[in-house]
């Protein structure tokens, strides 16, 4: 269980969205307070969802029907599938085809007509405007959003549930996952006290570096994690 929790938590650290939000908090008028509020929101969401998930699913027959090894193998296969999708860009190609409509003019030529902005685009614009606010409410909501259950998160919860450990051990595993996953915000919170400018510069450089990585770089990292999870799962069967 612990190896699965740590591997999945480490894979969350460098999420571009999470790092971008941390950089955003560091550039507020009160960066320490914003970062602390961001962390509180993240801990609240992640811890609350974890406890509800473990209590609800732990009371069902499903809890005893799978092992940690099976969770590791399943997580590894999903990671490899995601890596394949990133490499082939299947989703991106589908989205590009959907954003343009093919129509013909009087001469029979095929023209490309842009589709009006979708609801998702409008929602993204509103979210961007919301994040520009300087209220602590924005920091708290950002933390809640950053900690919304992801595939890594649910994989860790499944491993914790399948372990059959005591409630205290499961709670400790949840806390460990959250602390490791939010390292990207915890370290800047501490380092800002000693070197605010260097902290801002380092986080901005990290964000720029991640943005410069190609889709295949991300696919390679995801595939490596998937292979590691498969190896752990097969060795524990």
Swiss-Prot record:
Q: Does the keyword Nucleotide-binding apply?
A: no
Q: Which residues form a coiled coil?
A: none
Gene disruption phenotype: Accumulates the precursor SL1278. Can produce SL-1, albeit at reduced levels.
GO CC terms of this entry: plasma membrane
**Transmembrane regions listed in the UniProt entry:** 5-25, 38-58, 66-86, 141-161, 171-191, 217-237
Keyword set, alphabetical order = Cell inner membrane, Cell membrane, Cell wall biogenesis/degradation, Lipid transport, Membrane, Transmembrane, Transmembrane helix, Transport
Location in or out of the cell? Cell inner membrane
UniProt keyword annotation of Disulfide bond present: no
The way this protein sits in the membrane is described as: Multi-pass membrane protein
What biological process terms from GO does the record include? cell wall organization; lipid transport
Entry function: Required for the transport across the inner membrane of sulfolipid-1 (SL-1), which is a major cell wall lipid of pathogenic mycobacteria. Could also transport SL1278 (2-palmitoyl-3-(C43)-phthioceranyl-alpha, alpha'-D-trehalose-2'-sulfate), which is the precursor of SL-1. May potentiate SL-1 levels and confer specificity for sulfolipids over structurally similar glycolipids.
Indicate the family of this protein: Belongs to the peptidoglycolipid addressing protein (GAP) (TC 2.A.116) family.
Name of this chain's protein:
Sulfolipid-1 exporter Sap
What is the native source organism of this protein?
A: Mycobacterium tuberculosis (strain ATCC 25618 / H37Rv)
**Phylogenetic lineage:** Bacteria, Bacillati, Actinomycetota, Actinomycetes, Mycobacteriales
């Amino acid at each position: 269980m612990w190896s699965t929790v740590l591997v999945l938590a480490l894979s969350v650290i460098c999420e571009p969205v999470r790092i971008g939000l941390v950089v955003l908090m560091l550039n507020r008028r009160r960066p320490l307070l914003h970062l602390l509020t961001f962390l509180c929101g993240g801990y609240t969401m992640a811890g609350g969802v974890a406890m509800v998930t473990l209590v609800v699913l732990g009371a069902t027959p499903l809890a005893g029907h799978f092992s940690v090894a099976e969770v590791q193998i399943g997580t590894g296969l999903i990671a490899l599938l995601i890596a394949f999708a990133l490499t082939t860009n299947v989703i991106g190609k589908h989205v590009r085809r959907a954003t343009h409509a093919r129509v013909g003019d009087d001469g029979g030529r095929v023209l490309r007509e842009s589709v009006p902005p979708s609801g998702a685009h409008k929602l993204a614009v509103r979210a961007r405007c919301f994040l520009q606010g300087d209220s602590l409410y924005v920091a708290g909501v950002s933390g809640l959003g950053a900690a919304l259950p992801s595939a890594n998160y649910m994989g860790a919860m499944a491993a914790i549930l399948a372990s059959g450990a005591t409630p205290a051990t499961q709670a400790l595993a949840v806390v460990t996952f959250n602390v490791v996953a939010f390292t990207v915000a915890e370290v800047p919170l501490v380092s800002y006290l000693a070197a605010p400018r260097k902290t801002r510069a380092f986080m901005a450089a990290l964000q720029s570096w991640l943005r410069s990585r190609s889709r295949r770089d991300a696919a390679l990292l995801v595939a490596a994690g998937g292979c590691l999870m498969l190896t752990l799962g097969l060795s524990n069967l």
